[in-house]
Amino acid sequence: MHNLENKNASNKKPKKIVVSDLIAILTYLMEIKNKMTNKELWKIRHICLTGSYNNNQMSIMKILMNKFPKTINVPFDKQNNTYLHQSIFNRHKIFVDFFMNELNDNINYRSKNKIGISHLHALVNYGYIDHIETAIIKDPGAIQQLSDDGQNILEFAVIPCFSIISNKNSEPYKKSNTTIINIIKTLSKSITKLDLQSRNKMGYRAIECAVRYCSTDVIDELISLGFSINESRLKNRIFPTINNNDLIGFATQIDRLDMVKHLINIGAPIHMYHINKHNKLLVPTCLVVAIKFKRDQCIHYLLNLPESIQALSNNTIKKYLFNIATNAGCTNHEIISKLCPKTYDDKKLRKNCNRYKISVFEQHENKIERNIKNYYKRRFMILDSISNMLSILCSIYNFSDNDSDLHKITRTVVSLEANLLLKYTTINNVYETVADFVDHIELTDIQYCFETVSNSEIMKASDCIINEYFISMKKLGIFKKINRLIKSKNIINTLLNEFDSDSESTDDDSDTKRACSCGCQSCYDSDEDPVCDSNESDNSNDINNHVKSDNKLNSSNDYYDEDDSEDNYNNQSDDEPLVKNDVVNTINTITPNQNLENTFNENNVMINNINFEKTLNNKHQSFQDNICENISENISEKIPNNNRDNNCNNNHNNNIQGDKELFDKPLHLQYTRLTKLHEHYIHKSLYKLRHPIKLNQYDTVYNLLTSLDPYVKNNNNILVFNSDNKLIAKIFSLSIKSDTDYINDINSENDNVNMYHEKTKLQIRSKPSRWIRFYSQNICGLDKQDPNHMFPFVLDRILNDWPCIERRIRDKIHPDGLDSLLYFYGELLINGEMIRGCFEYFINSNNSVFHRLFREEYKLPQNIRDTLDESINVLSY
């Protein structure tokens, strides 16, 4: 048939074929065929199951099924859908009736498509009551089968129908509440008992789905079936309400006042929340949810309940609810007047309204999408994983020597690992996302923290050893940005808490996404590549593992697993330059096995027998296993005796002994690894080189910024090596007298009084007042590609916090700003010799670098040379 169509298409005037002749030809072809290919099955599906129905389509399908009845269970598209799947999803009732009546003995009702929906699940979801009864009579055990998302048969009965239709002109099918009740009654007649307490991978049951999508009559039917609504909460938490046995709180969250009233009338418990585990202050969780999500009608109703009246009699609880209302942006004066404590005035009211802008949430979600593929299709699980990682980091920072803190950290780690086992994301993606939130690209900090707290042997060690580990973790660079971590944690928790509310819509597409726990409508589109890829054989194991991990968490003795409060920390500046030391991953190597042997002469320094251990990144190994491949290389360098005054020569001779002590210490060789976040920052910093026209040197600068040059950085100096492990640059530390001038300059940035006189003087500072954010168009131009201009670009990442000589002058383009001229004292390998001088940077008030040059010492301005002479304790010469 396929060849016949192609032959006809190639002719200019194809011969018209009568439909009856086509059926006869197809019948003949079927008689001589021994098997059908997937392409042929898909072609017949395209002819029969799309478009409007006619008798010819049924004739073709009957011819196929009479010859090959087993093809009813054969998947033919990328989503592994069968003909029965497609007939149900497209609501071709005549084909469904034909398959169920004529091929009932050949149908495997447990056959799943690629997203884990079986034939019986599809029949129940679309409300084919007569055929449901036929199916459960033939295969009673199929009623207990779960989907790949852990959904049981009752959930498919109450959730909306999946909008998986090929005919775009058709309206999505909606089951009536009467149909849902009849389906539940039909399923209850099965000889196989239904598991009423089964929870899907999101942690909720069928009754929670009914609270969201169905009427109160469906709730009554489920309760008569045996569902319990009097279960206690799993944790002393407010959010999430959907998987914490808080039906009233969940109904309040989705703003279903009719369901709230009905649940209270039939005896559903109003759960009380301990606002602090150290006291007995209780508040209804549904009231907190209603205030947080601004459900005004529910608030008015809940405020009249006896539990709410008793709670509001306490001024502490009143203040707690008032803070939630102001932060949520409540503008209802009647509600505010009932919640406002008597001691509050207008000033305190304004102070408590510290809400985040919508753009802040959008920025965080954009960063998540940049690091995690298909984020919006699996929002809940990914947000939950990121929230757990941020909670781990904040708990490490706040760790004190007690069992409860350690238990909380361990429990959070278990929860994070359970989420990651669901294959919705990877641990490396979470690392990169958290690092992106705080502009900290040193992923090994986060990796080291997680590897440490997830190591059961370390967590079971003595208190002294555990404290040492936590002290070492608190010294990592990631915790210098603790304010950003806490802010990001609060933002992610807000997104997580409002996930169900945000997705609530009357649109059927949104209902469809929520019907599938992964929210992945494209999973059902037969014309797209599938996203969810779960093996049917592994389905039960994954679900059992998930349930076991949930039970471990639920059986914890620590019931008071409170919602994370906003901890207060000292305000500190989190602004960091765009191109900086931590734009790349750095991993410290093990101490070299051999000591460093130094040979010093009067006028030169020889360095021999350095044994480095190079760190390579291996995604399939843990952090401890990443250290491998020992590289032994003889590195020699010779420093010439340049002309310099006697004072500096004496200083050089006095520092030889200090050099010996420096090189006798273990060297920590740091290697770089290109990451997605690295590429993002590099690409952003080169904006001026590609807009509006891409310059010729763009690729050169990009390659230099992403070069993998190793370096060694300690308190005294920086050593930079090339790819052959040869020393090519040194930067020495300078003695710092005081940073008072530096602080004064920062505080008086926009002060125009005597600005020129005060800012032009030279100062030795502990770090530059500003650093590189963008590269200007003249960097690496045709006349700036000599060795002096092309010194290692890795220094642009690691000098942002290094002592330097700085001169600040008025910005001619922006008169209110100040430009910085920076000098870093060191040596550079030029023509095989180490030349002493200064690495010079010129950075304007907008943090754009216009000039980077290594200037030999004899070419330095006299005032720079005099300042260098005044600096004491140059560690290496």
Curated annotation (Swiss-Prot):
Keyword list, A-Z: ANK repeat, Repeat
Transmembrane region(s): none
ANK repeat windows: 44-74, 79-109, 115-145, 202-231, 243-272, 282-311
Ranges of Low complexity composition bias in the record: 533-544
InterPro entries according to UniProt: Ankyrin_rpt (IPR002110), Ankyrin_rpt-contain_sf (IPR036770)
Residue ranges of the region described as Disordered: 525-579
Protein name: Putative ankyrin repeat protein R748
Native species: Acanthamoeba polyphaga mimivirus
